[in-house]
């Protein structure tokens, strides 16, 4: 990706956001950066960002109503951080402890998705080239859903990663 001087601009910006997420201390900031890094692959149309993030993001993590809700929540939390809205409004009625726990969990989930997505395209040159430019990314998402699944392969299991590797109290 970095060998191509003029290519992969969107993915490079997304990867920089991923690295910023790894360096960030606050969970809201980490989550914001990880979701933005995933968004680099999704290339949502203006005015359809949330819709495309949820729909297209399912290619990376699987298709189910639970996954759709997860992606919608991650995008909602990212929007809170991006627009400086109070995350307590997003989690209205929950205790401070529960808000912290859910935000940390969401941050980890977004990190897992971002990590697996960048790792996959960096390990597969055939896949990486499909994300070389905005035009190639647009063409990628115009493919038939079954073809997309065949090209991408097995989605990452976010819930298993959370069960195996996440401790919200650390």
Predicted regions and their residues:
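Amphipathic, oligomerization/interface secondary-structure segments
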Residues: 1-170
